[in-house]
UniProtKB/Swiss-Prot annotation:
Chief location category: cytoplasm
Protein name: Alcohol dehydrogenase 1A
Organism: Homo sapiens
Top-level EC class as recorded in UniProt: oxidoreductase
Family membership: Belongs to the zinc-containing alcohol dehydrogenase family.
SMART domains found in the cross-reference section: PKS_ER
Intracellular or extracellular location(s): Cytoplasm
């Protein structure tokens, strides 16, 4: 019996309060309006960005259904939808691609003006929610809210992918892999024979290492205080791994000594102000490029000496690794299917969706790289 055009009741993980566990609730998911798509979720990854909301370092309206790194199957579409149809395998896009705004028309950027990151409203693009729980509207997250068995997204925030793709793996292309890999190949534009430093060895940091290796870097130095992650980093391309706690001097000084004055490219993939500055300082003063990849704490500022840039350094950042989402995500899935890269090493745990809080515990303990929740 078709559910198209009807309200669907399903399970979702609702965050009612900051710093509290998720509550598995029955929610009502309204049908898609014009130019919207309702998706049955199959697999979703637990990303550090979701945890930033739980901890309060990233601000979004509450109560909310989080989740933004996922893959599923189209259940129904609203009027006027042309790019996907019921039954299609898809990846929801935390950064949409409307194709019409100034940013979408700029070949150098992917930060579509329809995004819900800069000034989060917690709604779809028409300003309303499709979720109801306990007779209350529930906010969306980044316009996609994938910690729910069903979700509704705008058409410009979903990409059709290869029908043969394994959703429990390619869901990582929705955020973590693309963000890290793209930061190296698109944003920094790592060059063959170069030296790189990657701060933070979670799923995104390891993906950045994969990107540095793919771009031909000769030396990739992985930096983390959790030595348990070093073996995986080396498996994926790191040539050396160092722990800042093993040194009495600042880690940027250690890296500069190791690399004859500084690395060519550095990546901060943690989201801490102190490591962002260390990442900048460790790249060569005359020609180094440092990329901010980790989501910084909300409403906190960095103070720095402009001379650090005047000498020739470049300091930049990007969302989703600089990939234009709707056109690039299907290409990345195609590359995965062609075995141009593997995602297996990033996935350490697979849990049923109902064990979402256990998945976040694994993240907090440093025991997981990526936990995939299966619906």
């Amino acid at each position: 019996m078709s559910t198209a055009g009807k309200v669907i009741k399903c399970k979702a993980a609702v965050l009612w309060e900051l710093k509290k566990p998720f509550s598995i609730e029955e929610v009502e998911v309204a049908p898609p309006k014009a130019h919207e798509v309702r998706i049955k979720m199959v697999a979703v990854g637990i990303c550090g960005t979701d945890d930033h909301v739980v901890s309060g370092t990233m601000v979004t309206p509450l109560p909310v259904i989080l989740g933004h790194e996922a893959a599923g199957i189209v259940e129904s579409v609203g009027e006027g939808v042309t790019t996907v149809k019921p039954g299609d395998k898809v990846i929801p896009l935390a950064i949409p691609q409307c194709g019409k705004c100034r940013i979408c028309k700029n070949p150098e950027s992917n930060y579509c003006l329809k995004n819900d990151v800069s000034n989060p409203q917690g709604t779809l693009q028409d300003g309303t929610s499709r979720f109801t729980c306990r007779r209350k509207p529930i906010h969306h997250f980044l316009g996609i809210s994938t910690f729910s068995q069903y979700t509704v997204v705008d058409e410009n925030a979903v990409a059709k992918i290869d029908a043969a793709s394994p959703l429990e793996k390619v869901c990582l292309i929705g955020c973590g892999f693309s963000t890290g890999y793209g930061s190296a190949v698109n944003v920094a534009k790592v060059t063959p024979g170069s030296t790189c430093a990657v701060f933070g060895l979670g799923g995104v940091g390891l993906s950045a290492i994969m990107g540095c290796k793919a771009a031909g870097a000769a030396r990739i130095i992985a930096v983390d205080i959790n030595k348990d992650k070093f073996a995986k980093a080396k498996e994926l391309g790191a040539t050396e791994c160092i722990n800042p706690q093993d040194y009495k001097k600042p880690i940027q000084e250690v890296l500069k000594e190791m690399t004859d004055g500084g690395v060519d490219f550095s990546f901060e993939v943690i989201g801490r102000l102190d490591t962002m500055m260390a990442s900048l300082l460790c790249c060569h003063e005359a020609c180094g490029t440092s990329v901010i990849v980790g989501v910084p704490p909300d409403s906190q500022n960095l103070s720095m000496n402009p001379m650090l840039l005047l000498t020739g350094r470049t300091w930049k950042g990007a969302i989703l690794g600089g990939f234009k989402s709707k056109e690039c995500v299907p290409k990345l899935v195609a590359d995965f299917m062609a075995k141009k890269f593997s995602l297996d090493a990033l996935i350490t745990h697979v849990l049923p969706f109902e064990k979402i809080n256990e998945g976040f515990d694994l993240l907090h303990s440093g025991k997981s790289i990526r936990t995939i929740l299966m619906f």
